[in-house]
């Protein structure tokens, strides 16, 4: 365990509780900091805040008063979801108070090396694949970040011979100062989270923070097929390891002769991979690159790929009813994810889509509707998806209020041999707390049809 003294007797403001804020506050108190916790939700409605107050922390709820910054604050640890435009963060920046996220805190207290994985899509699948490959290769991985345990809950206990594998969002990466993963993987980039970042350029620069502190002793795993990612990799001083599904990469990972290769050596036959979807080959190449850089054998990688069928809510097979296959892709919170999901199937498909309106149209989906026989829309974006479906010339287009209704309608529009696919192309927050809740409700609704 790493001994950490830098926070002792320092006044540290934890802004926004939720799971990561709760873990950060608890850790900082353990490390001897004077922790002030602030959350916008009233204390009476905030179970986690009440628990932290019971631990003796100074808890302020119901808003973000600027007066908190007058308490000789040394550091602000913010919830990733709170935008930097929030007045208290603007004021903290003006006062030159460092602002970090929980992942930065985790890195500072750990003696274990980190693997960081970011991108617009495929992060969770790649992170899970990496974890499984490292585990199979006896490299003692610990999974943390957006999936698994909150990073700062496990980081201090992680030993030098272990590896902390983290899935990282742009929100988390905006708040890094010293964070220096031994291996940083950047999977892809497309326009997303513009309500938070403003422009695709700013979004990409936030992601590129994963390279911020890399040195020549570190590695950057880069998607050579993504021009934006390649351009942003210029920010890395680490050794670049490229992967591609479209061209041969001599000093990286690629597909050749129906097999996956790393630095010229065949690792696994494509036919041995059970994870469906062409897009998942990108995720596999990235995970394989990380595993090989950390010394995992081809045999261990192959063993994982022969059994790894995917991650819950990511093109997850649910069941078959009357020869109709149901798939839960609730994690598809943007168009690119839905494009890749639709590309994974050649069968006639009934698509369920819709959710939070972030201001974009859905015309980019039109070329991917070639196998879509019907669409059932729901949520705030239903009218926009209907417009895109009409432009695509779909004959069967229907809008409903709830996901339960959408499942019933989708089944009614299906016939023998069809795929019924939930791939919303939108975030879930208009009707659900999380994409996981949305996926679980979809699965429950499907089982009601039996």
From Swiss-Prot:
<dbReference type="InterPro" id="IPR004101">
    <property type="entry name" value="Mur_ligase_C"/>
</dbReference>
<dbReference type="GO" id="GO:0005737">
    <property type="term" value="C:cytoplasm"/>
</dbReference>
<keyword id="KW-0067">ATP-binding</keyword>
<dbReference type="InterPro" id="IPR013221">
    <property type="entry name" value="Mur_ligase_cen"/>
</dbReference>
<dbReference type="GO" id="GO:0005524">
    <property type="term" value="F:ATP binding"/>
</dbReference>
<dbReference type="GO" id="GO:0009252">
    <property type="term" value="P:peptidoglycan biosynthetic process"/>
</dbReference>
<comment type="pathway">
    <text>Cell wall biogenesis; peptidoglycan biosynthesis.</text>
</comment>
<dbReference type="InterPro" id="IPR036615">
    <property type="entry name" value="Mur_ligase_C_dom_sf"/>
</dbReference>
<keyword id="KW-0131">Cell cycle</keyword>
<keyword id="KW-0547">Nucleotide-binding</keyword>
<keyword id="KW-0963">Cytoplasm</keyword>
<dbReference type="Pfam" id="PF08245">
    <property type="entry name" value="Mur_ligase_M"/>
</dbReference>
<dbReference type="Pfam" id="PF02875">
    <property type="entry name" value="Mur_ligase_C"/>
</dbReference>
<dbReference type="GO" id="GO:0008764">
    <property type="term" value="F:UDP-N-acetylmuramoylalanine-D-glutamate ligase activity"/>
</dbReference>
<dbReference type="GO" id="GO:0051301">
    <property type="term" value="P:cell division"/>
</dbReference>
<protein>
    <recommendedName>
        <fullName>UDP-N-acetylmuramoylalanine--D-glutamate ligase</fullName>
        <ecNumber>6.3.2.9</ecNumber>
    </recommendedName>
</protein>
<keyword id="KW-0133">Cell shape</keyword>
<comment type="function">
    <text>Cell wall formation. Catalyzes the addition of glutamate to the nucleotide precursor UDP-N-acetylmuramoyl-L-alanine (UMA).</text>
</comment>
<feature type="binding site">
    <location>
        <begin position="119"/>
        <end position="125"/>
    </location>
    <ligand>
        <name>ATP</name>
    </ligand>
</feature>
<comment type="similarity">
    <text>Belongs to the MurCDEF family.</text>
</comment>
<dbReference type="Pfam" id="PF21799">
    <property type="entry name" value="MurD-like_N"/>
</dbReference>
<keyword id="KW-0436">Ligase</keyword>
<dbReference type="InterPro" id="IPR005762">
    <property type="entry name" value="MurD"/>
</dbReference>
<dbReference type="InterPro" id="IPR036565">
    <property type="entry name" value="Mur-like_cat_sf"/>
</dbReference>
<dbReference type="GO" id="GO:0071555">
    <property type="term" value="P:cell wall organization"/>
</dbReference>
<keyword id="KW-0132">Cell division</keyword>
<keyword id="KW-0573">Peptidoglycan synthesis</keyword>
<keyword id="KW-0961">Cell wall biogenesis/degradation</keyword>
<dbReference type="GO" id="GO:0008360">
    <property type="term" value="P:regulation of cell shape"/>
</dbReference>
């Amino acid at each position: 365990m790493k001994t950490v003294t830098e926070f002792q007797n320092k006044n540290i403001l934890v802004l926004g509780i939720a799971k990561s804020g709760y873990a950060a506050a608890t850790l900082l108190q353990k490390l001897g900091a004077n922790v002030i916790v602030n959350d916008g939700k009233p204390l009476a409605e905030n179970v986690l805040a009440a628990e932290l107050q019971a631990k003796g922390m100074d808890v302020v709820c119901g808003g973000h008063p600027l007066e908190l910054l007058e308490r000789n604050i040394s550091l602000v640890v913010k919830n990733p979801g709170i935008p930097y435009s929030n007045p208290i963060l603007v004021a903290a920046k003006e006062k030159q108070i460092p602002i970090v996220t929980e992942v930065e805190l985790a890195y500072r207290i750990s003696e274990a090396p980190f693997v960081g994985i970011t991108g617009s899509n495929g992060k969770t699948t790649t992170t899970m694949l990496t974890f499984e490959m490292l585990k199979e290769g006896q490299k003692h991985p610990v999974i943390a970040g957006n999936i698994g345990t909150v990073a700062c809950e496990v980081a201090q206990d992680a030993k030098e011979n272990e590896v902390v594998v983290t899935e990282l969002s742009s929100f988390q990466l905006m708040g890094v100062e010293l964070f220096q993963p031994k291996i940083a993987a950047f999977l892809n980039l497309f326009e997303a989270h513009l309500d938070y970042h403003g422009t695709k350029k700013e979004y990409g620069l936030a992601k590129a923070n994963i390279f911020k502190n890399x040195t020549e002793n570190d590695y950057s795993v880069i998607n050579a097929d993504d021009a934006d990612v390649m351009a942003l990799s210029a920010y890395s001083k680490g050794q670049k390891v490229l992967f591609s599904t479209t061209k041969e990469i001599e000093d990286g990972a690629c597909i050749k002769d129906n097999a996956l290769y790393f630095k010229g050596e065949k690792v696994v036959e494509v036919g041995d991979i059970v994870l469906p979807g062409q897009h998942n080959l990108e995720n596999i190449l990235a995970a394989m690159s990380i595993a090989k850089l950390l010394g995992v054998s081809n045999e261990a990688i192959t063993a994982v790929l022969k059994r790894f069928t995917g991650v819950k809510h990511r093109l997850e097979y649910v069941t078959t009813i009357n020869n109709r296959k149901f798939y839960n892709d609730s994690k598809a919170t943007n168009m690119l994810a839905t494009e890749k999901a639709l590309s994974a199937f050649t069968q006639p498909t009934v698509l369920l889509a819709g959710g939070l309106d972030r201001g974009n149209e859905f015309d980019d989906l039109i070329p991917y509707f070639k196998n879509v026989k019907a669409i059932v829309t729901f949520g705030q974006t239903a009218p926009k998806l209907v417009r895109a479906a009409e432009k695509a010339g779909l004959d069967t287009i229907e809008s409903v209020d709830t996901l339960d209704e959408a499942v019933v309608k989708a089944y009614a529009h299906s016939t023998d041999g069809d795929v019924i696919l939930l791939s919303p192309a939108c975030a879930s927050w208009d009707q659900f707390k999380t994409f996981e809740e949305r996926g679980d409700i979809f699965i429950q609704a499907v089982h009601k049809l039996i």
